């Protein structure tokens, strides 16, 4: 079981103990980490705090392959169970992408899909990126999704290789 903040944690004993398995996988931009709410009461939901890992997954095909995406635009991959991490954020990705969902391909090694959004920046375009080489290169794949339907989720069909499902608003 994994849990995340700005670091990724894992438990192997049903939550009795946790081990941090990553460095900070966000931009750690202090300007984005201010307390939210008004001058009298603070917001205690933490929904306005940023620099947080929003999505993470482990590969069902490759042992020790982990992916993470943050709400401040970064994508990281680890091929050794979290001992080492590489920033593989797509070069053509707009700044401050909120990565909402990551999915590994059920049959192709090294392949992952990330769904992101920038609606909080008044950008309602869909953003889905695919890599087939562990994040070395990326391709934006949004053909067929209306231009103002921002993306929240991406899932690969486990029975029909090559079929993807996108969750949009």
Residue ranges with predicted function:
Residues 1-169:
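Beta-propeller blade termini and top-face loops
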